């Protein structure tokens, strides 16, 4: 992993951020109250093959029941707040103020998007990520009601496939994501996948 501070920790302009994604680099912070940001270029990258996504049987049942109403891009502020807030399972988060501001700017210009699960009129879970070319870079997800973020992920994969995306980048893999088909690929292989994804354009 490569990590270094950007020229100005408080300002990450959209153009700079998109150039970083195009070369396989993304920003993180140690924790939410740390004002500094560093850039990451992992030796191994997490991806979910869009044609290899696995939905566990219990989640299939939840999706069929239609418990959640799915919306796109209707509450970016609520989603990033949910992702940035610690929970019982995840007491620490890497989303600090500079990162919030940077992705809010990307959202304004159409390069950051949300998938949201709503339950009884309230935001129950969601995820957000960056789009560039035919690639979607998943950033973070959160849930306030069981399976909400999982339903969002399943919807995202279906939506990306339908819209012509070819790469779903999860940055890293976790046992949770591996249940859905996530796998690690070496940096060189990932960069080849990224190059192909950047050759075309897909609309979210």
From Swiss-Prot:
Functions in the N-end rule pathway of protein degradation where it conjugates Leu, Phe and, less efficiently, Met from aminoacyl-tRNAs to the N-termini of proteins containing an N-terminal arginine or lysine. The gene is aat. One of its GO terms (cellular component) is cytoplasm. It is found in: Cytoplasm. It comes from the Bacteria. Its EC number is 2.3.2.6. GO terms for biological process: protein catabolic process. It comes from Brucella abortus (strain 2308). It catalyses: N-terminal L-lysyl-[protein] + L-leucyl-tRNA(Leu) = N-terminal L-leucyl-L-lysyl-[protein] + tRNA(Leu) + H(+); N-terminal L-arginyl-[protein] + L-leucyl-tRNA(Leu) = N-terminal L-leucyl-L-arginyl-[protein] + tRNA(Leu) + H(+); L-phenylalanyl-tRNA(Phe) + an N-terminal L-alpha-aminoacyl-[protein] = an N-terminal L-phenylalanyl-L-alpha-aminoacyl-[protein] + tRNA(Phe). InterPro entries: Acyl_CoA_acyltransferase, Leu/Phe-tRNA_Trfase, Leu/Phe-tRNA_Trfase_C, Leu/Phe-tRNA_Trfase_N. Its main location: cytoplasm. This is Leucyl/phenylalanyl-tRNA--protein transferase. GO terms for molecular function: leucyl-tRNA--protein transferase activity. Keywords: Acyltransferase, Cytoplasm, Transferase. Pfam families: Leu_Phe_trans. The lineage of its organism: Bacteria, Pseudomonadati, Pseudomonadota, Alphaproteobacteria, Hyphomicrobiales. HAMAP family: Leu_Phe_trans. Belongs to the L/F-transferase family.
